[in-house]
Amino acid sequence: MTVTLDRDPDLGDLVAVVRDRKPVELGDGAREAMAETRAVVEEIVAANDRPVYGVNTGFGDLHDVAIDPADGRQLQRNLLHANTTVGDPLPVEAVRAAMFARAAVFAAGHSGVRPDVVERLLDCLNAGVHPVVGAGGNSDDYGANARIGYVLTGEGEAFYGGERLPGGDALAAAGIDPLSVEPKEALPMMDGPALMTGRLGLAVHDAERLLAAADLAGACTFALLGEQPSAFSPRVAEVRPNEGDAESARVVREALALETETDATVAQDPLSIRTIPQINGSAREALANARPVAATELGAPGDNPLVFPDGVVLSCGGFNGQHVSAAADALARALVKVGHAAERRVHLYVQGRGESPPFVAGDPGLESGLVRAHYSAASLVREAGTLASASDRNSVVSAGQEDVQSLGTVATDHLATTVEKIRAAVAVELLCAVEVRRLTDAAVPGAAGAVVDGVVDRLDATDRSVQIETVARLVADGTVTDLAREAGLDLP
């Protein structure tokens, strides 16, 4: 399957190209739209009768410095050369996400770049030429975007064929010609929330699977340790109409084929069980907010200035990533609470509540069971919690002109790390259910039971660290949710 990048990319396209390495091509509609606005830029350069930011002016607080048209190409090269990142390289996945997101913005047709620029980005994606981008020192995405653009011109460094090479050598090895940067092309290469948008899109995809798995792990825990099902009654959602709460309660209820209005003898279970719908539901609503933000930013022009086919060029703040930053911070905070509740339920297992033997051990005392895995879960949640403060509370100032930043690059980096850590904490909870099932033959009904049995079948290792990593991988790759769906459960 080839992904055609036209004017309406979606998050599925992002995942297909970035992770599944599906080939991608530029669509005819996008090519035509880009050609129209590129013609506007070329007319501006030829006439040189009005100042247009980044075309015939300097940058930032030097926006009032006129640039001779003869220096237009050098101006663009200098801009790419001036931007920096520091530290260890970003993961290849993050760089691919930024490349796809930037290509998608160019394809929208308001950046004024030639189709050749997008073609070169897509050539690198298809060939596996991945620019080396330092993970630190990004003021929004400027540095990361510029390092990607630098490689397109044959400069910088890139990973190709398992090697770290000079950018020109990587392009040559892949059979790709370096790009000659024309007026206004380096500015949009650098501008806009590409890295943060791509990473938010991937995190949304991952969080969808994580939250479904968190509901399923919670369902397993209720089946093994809980006693009062009324917390999952649809009548609660009817009088408290929070969509996320209702959805999480439904998943738990249907995963266990649970009758919620019974004569249970226990008045109520611990809060970590009783509030699964509220805690996971709150995260679902944060996810529901983040999803359209990622989708909108992926396909919307994110540049300054914006170029229109009728010749109008508008200076604006469309490159600012505040929507991404706010959505990423909110989702990260909500996921930390999901992990905290999962860790508290692991504590209930270790206590020996319900069907669980103490420490979830076959021979408590002689064996330590999963108590150390509980420690790991607690540490993971704490580590994630340190990242959950607002990333955009500070800003970077440049000569009083570029005086606020969204810091969405930081927010989405924190979100990616949070998803990974909370996924592992949820994996520990699910591992507890699997181990109780193995040790005691306790029953977990319905689709939740199918998940437990399916994980048991895939868990060969006895090393606890490997077990946690295995279960976390089954959450990440969708196996856990697939097992539930195959058992008849409707998952979002």
Where are the language model's segments positioned?
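C-terminal auxiliary extensions adjacent to catalytic cores
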Residues: M1-K22, L26-A33, T37-N48, V117, ...
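Short alpha-helical scaffolding segments that buttress acidic/His motifs in well-ordered protein cores
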Residues: L14, L79, A94, A98-R102, ...
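FAD-binding core of FAD-dependent oxidoreductases
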Residues: Y53-L75, A82-A104, V132-E155, E163-L171, ...
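Acidic, glycine-rich active-site loops and adjacent beta-strand->loop/helix elements
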Residues: G58-F59, A104-V105, L125, G137-S139, ...
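Alpha-helix capping at helix-to-loop junctions
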Residues: A103-A107, D123-H130, E157, L216, ...
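Short, well-structured alpha-helical patches and their helix-loop capping segments
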Residues: G109-V113, G136-A144, R199-L202, D206
